[in-house]
Amino acid sequence: MSLNLFWFLPTHGDGHYLGTEEGARPVDYGYLQQIAQAADRIGFTGVLIPTGRSCEDAWLVAAAMIPVTQRLKFLVALRPSVVSPTVAARQAATLDRLSNGRALFNLVTGSDPTELAGDGVFLDHTERYEASAEFTRVWRRLLEGDTVTYEGKHIRVRDAKLYFPPVQQPRPPLYFGGSSDVAQDLAAEQVDLYLTWGEPPEQVKEKIEQVRAKAAAHGRKVRFGIRLHVIVRETNQEAWQAADRLISHLDDDTIAKAQAALAKTDSVGQHRMASLHNGKRENLEISPNLWAGVGLVRGGAGTALVGDGPTVAARINEYADLGIDSFILSGYPHLEEAYNVGELLFPHLDVAIPEIPQPRPLQVQGEAVANEFIPRKTAQS
């Protein structure tokens, strides 16, 4: 099975070390362009663009990177409860059209009550997933060309439709990650690819089996992906030394503050990540070559595969054997580590290198009439 390898645009900051300004670098348009173009040339399938108040806006960053790349896809966040499904569908179709079919979408329900309140969202964990399920039903149908009337607990729309369809048919793929039961239920019913953070293989296997069974109950099949950091070097010793350097400026106070902040979220996945290290610097290799040091101060993906190219490739293939075909990777600093992965890891994997999409013929149409319908050229009889 060929693997889809993604990279990451660090719109929330980048550098050589975690938890310090030492070795940090400014993340501006030029730097993001460097990373995107490197990922494009190396052969990554796409890049994940993070979302949240500590990040630049993912949609604007993706739009800015489209003209400077050729084949790279952009995985951007859909935020139910923050934006309506109708507006989100129009945005998604536009991004897909502007990129000639290089748009992918990641459903993000949110987990930080403080950040959500700042965005005007006051739903609890279960309610957010209810709203996300309703949002996704409407969003999918609109992109598939339906005119949608929907009456739900959280979402109500009447005669909603898109005038400009996406390039990818029937619609761009939808990604989603969540570890709770309600999250898995949503994935089983609605999404195309279920994501997990980088837990040990036995834990990932359990989640995959649960989601696969729930999807089968809906008569569906779901693909699987995993989100991991990587530290790959020419030798295993060099890789582990690089891992130690990454957290060499962390002090106990910074770790404690980070863990206290992350504990406030209601994310089951975040709590599972925290349980892998329990805020302690000792015994961070939680599974062969799987290192939990990143999670001492970083929310979300908190583990890294560490080793030389053949070793990291072997661990990736262990996850692939569980049914995972997509790997969303990152490493510090993201520009240099992209090249490390391309040069030291890619040769040891069966990597699906994306092709440059060819221009597609556009449908002839006139200006919208009274904002109600679009005149189109009719076939001659």
Curated annotation (Swiss-Prot):
Q: Name one Pfam family in it.
A: Bac_luciferase
InterPro entries under this entry? Alkanesulphonate_mOase_FMN-dep (IPR019911), Luciferase-like_dom (IPR011251), Luciferase-like_sf (IPR036661), SsuD_RutA_monooxygenase (IPR050172)
Q: What keywords would UniProt list here?
A: Flavoprotein, FMN, Monooxygenase, Oxidoreductase
Gene3D superfamilies membership: Luciferase-like domain
Q: Which reaction does it catalyse?
A: an alkanesulfonate + FMNH2 + O2 = an aldehyde + FMN + sulfite + H2O + 2 H(+)
Q: Which CDD domains match?
A: Alkanesulfonate_monoxygenase (cd01094)
Q: Name which cysteines form disulfide bonds.
A: none
Q: Name one GO biological process term.
A: alkanesulfonate catabolic process
Question: EC number(s) for this protein?
Answer: 1.14.14.5
Name the enzyme's class.
oxidoreductase
Which positions make up the signal peptide?
none
Q: Give one GO term, molecular function aspect.
A: alkanesulfonate monooxygenase activity
Q: What does the UniProt function comment say about this protein?
A: Catalyzes the desulfonation of aliphatic sulfonates.
Share any extra remarks: FMNH(2) which is absolutely required for this enzymatic reaction, is provided by SsuE.
Quote the subunit structure annotation: Homotetramer.
Q: Which family does it belong to?
A: Belongs to the SsuD family.
Per its UniProt record, what HAMAP family does this chain match?
Alkanesulf_monooxygen
What protein name does the entry list?
Answer: Alkanesulfonate monooxygenase
Species per Swiss-Prot/TrEMBL record: Enterobacter sp. (strain 638)
Organism phylogeny: Bacteria, Pseudomonadati, Pseudomonadota, Gammaproteobacteria, Enterobacterales
Gene name of this polypeptide = ssuD
